[in-house]
Swiss-Prot record:
PANTHER family listed in its UniProt record: CYTOCHROME B
Protein name, entry field: Cytochrome b
InterPro entries: Cyt_b/b6_C, Cyt_b/b6_C_sf, Cyt_b/b6_N, Cytb/b6-like_sf, Cytochrome_b, Cytochrome_b_C_euk/bac, Cytochrome_b_N_euk/bac, Di-haem_cyt_TM
Source organism superkingdom: Eukaryota
Family: Belongs to the cytochrome b family.
Role of this protein: Component of the ubiquinol-cytochrome c reductase complex (complex III or cytochrome b-c1 complex) that is part of the mitochondrial respiratory chain. The b-c1 complex mediates electron transfer from ubiquinol to cytochrome c. Contributes to the generation of a proton gradient across the mitochondrial membrane that is then used for ATP synthesis.
Gene name tied to this protein: MT-CYB
Residues engaged in binding heme b b562: 82, 183
Miscellaneous information on this protein: Heme 1 (or BL or b562) is low-potential and absorbs at about 562 nm, and heme 2 (or BH or b566) is high-potential and absorbs at about 566 nm.
Alphabetized PROSITE patterns for the sequence: CYTB_CTER, CYTB_NTER
């Protein structure tokens, strides 16, 4: 008798990771889930090791990071593995989300899969932001000041929330301690949400490029797609190694190599690159409250996508074309978010933001509905 039949936990793992029936026509764009899980495990491991050397105090935080880099054996590799691992984690998850949008992977009956995925993305963003503050560099400090002050846009309770986040009347030691605590805790919540995400997916099974719910063309995941995922994992490990060992500061900001100074504001305050598209939307709207509302509306639209969209754009020509314009729009917003505000970048940012909402709130439901009606009319004739 096999061991996994004797031990319940091994039986569950075998059912969901080895014997799980998978459509045989999946391509490499379906590697995102396993690669994201690999990066989450890497981030948790390196984060726990970094926490052993980090000091959560405004007077020692920056020095403790420098001590880790110079005095701890392999400390530099550990720090850069965590920093660049966050970037690769977001790249993998963004590609995973974009694949889901393209193929309509969140369409009914898989709404819970999509919604739980958006929740995971939100928790990732919060975790990464508060982690960016911990080195207590110049950009960390001022980024925390700018982003936490957005809470004042909330009517009535906004200032109270901001002061609670700060733990006082400015970003200081209580803020750093709270962020350190949250940053250590949230990855474990992410792991739990990931398990729920997988469980929701396995309830109805994986989608496929054709969008056909077939129960006949299925093969076990472990024997075949495990090897395919291994190829993706090796490629990701190669990119990861190149970043860590050859270009460790490529995706970072040089101002964060300077200790935080509350009396000197950086010329251009920017978050990490994977938040730049959100930052560009926020900057394109002059009113703070409306900017925060716009960000909330973006994520509300993502939550509502299984209900307002009518499947992916793989076989819908207009939807597919609009999808690629949406992707170009997000990339342009990312570029704009990393540049200083000028009349031209401000105008282009407003145009890109307007198109983003036009795509999410108008194109998704309307064009999908019109294409469906046209297809039904063609079949009837």
């Amino acid at each position: 008798m096999r061991m996994h039949n004797k031990i319940q936990l091994l039986s569950v793992l075998n059912t969901h990771l080895v014997a799980y029936p998978t459509p045989m026509n999946l391509n490499y764009s379906w590697n995102g889930g396993s690669l994201a899980g690999m990066m989450l495990a890497s981030q948790m491991l390196t984060g726990i090791l970094l926490a052993m050397h980090y000091v959560g105090h405004v007077d020692y935080a920056f020095a403790s990071v420098q001590h880790l880099m110079t005095d701890v054996p392999s400390g530099m590799i550990l720090r850069y593995a965590h920093a660049n691992g966050a970037s690769l984690f977001f790249i993998v998850v963004y590609l995973h989300v974009l694949r889901g949008m393209y193929y309509g992977s969140g369409a009914q009956p898989r709404e819970i899969v999509w919604i739980s995925g958006v929740v995971i993305l939100l928790v990732m963003i919060i975790t990464a932001f508060i982690g960016y503050v911990l080195p207590w560099g110049q950009m960390s400090f001022w980024g925390a000041t700018v982003i936490t002050s957005l809470a004042t846009a909330i009517p009535v309770v906004g200032k109270h929330i901001m002061y609670w986040l700060w733990g006082g009347f400015s970003v200081d030691n209580p803020t750093l301690n709270r962020f350190y605590s949250f940053h250590y805790t949230l990855p474990f919540i992410l792991a739990g949400l990931s398990v729920f995400h997988i469980a929701a997916l396995h309830q109805y099974g994986s989608t496929n490029p054709l969008g056909v719910n077939s129960q006949s063309s299925l093969i076990s995941f472990g024997s075949y797609f495990g090897a395919k995922d291994l190829v993706g994992a090796l490629f990701l490990a190669l990119v990861f190694s190149i970043l860590v060992f050859f270009y460790p500061d490529l995706l970072g900001h040089p101002d964060n190599l300077i200790p935080a100074n509350p009396y000197s504001t950086p010329q251009h305050i920017v978050p990490e690159w994977y938040f730049l598209w959100v930052y560009a939307i926020l900057r394109s709207i002059p009113n703070k409250a409306m900017g925060v509302l716009a960000i909330g509306l973006v994520f509300a639209s993502l939550f509502a996508m299984p209900f307002i969209g009518l499947g992916g754009g793989k076989f819908r020509i207009i939807t597919e074309w609009l999808y690629w314009t949406f992707l170009a729009d997000v990339l342009l917003l990312t570029w704009l978010g990393g540049n200083e505000i000028t009349p031209i970048t401000s105008f282009v940012g407003q145009c890109c933001t307007a198109y983003l909402f036009f795509y999410l709130l108008v194109c998704q439901p309307l064009v999908g509905y019109l294409e469906t009606q046209f297809a039904h009319g063609t079949q009837t004739n």
